[in-house]
Amino acid sequence: SNPDFLKKELGQAGLRLWFHANGIDESNVHKPYKAKSHGLGNSQILPRDYVKQRDIEIILREMAEQVAIRLRRAGKKTTVVSIHLGFSKQEQKRSIHTQMKVEPTNNTSLLVSYVLKLFHSKYTSGAVRSVAVSYSGFVDESFALISLFDEVDKLEKEERLQTAIDSIREQFGFTSLLKATALEDASRSIARSKLIGGHSAGGLDGLK
């Protein structure tokens, strides 16, 4: 096999496989590979205290989706999902910061489920005033781990739908396609999109 092809498809792991298969000591060929710890994320201070769990979940879902779009635009998949929740001063509670390692993905549905899983694992009660969602530990989007239990057809359909939605938002703006929850009082998608065109001040970095 061509080592350049393997490196393109599988990254450094593919190159190491080629060295191993051809009996080459890779330590004499290049320096050990060190992954750069870059990340993508959004954070926001809420306009009021969010007390209801469902309201906080709406915010987390929106942010998880927004960062997932940026992840796909960067051509990456994440292996680490993190959230941060800051409480109202009146709560006198320590903020929550938690993360989990996941199989490489940039699938919105999966990332939303991971973010909510982290939230449910740590949050019990209290008025939340700031929220952050971030993804890190990137690999190239061509990287895929398919197990015997994966529903490949379903994943491919989700990917095609995701691509179509991304394309529409790229052309007409993020708010051109929103879930029904965007009309609820707890939602921040529409309000944030109006701040300086929906860019960094609105927390929708890189999104129209």
Per-segment meaning from a language model:
Residues 1-126:
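DNA-contacting surface of Y-family translesion DNA polymerases
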Residues 97, 101-208:
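Acidic, metal-coordinating catalytic segment for phosphate/diphosphate chemistry
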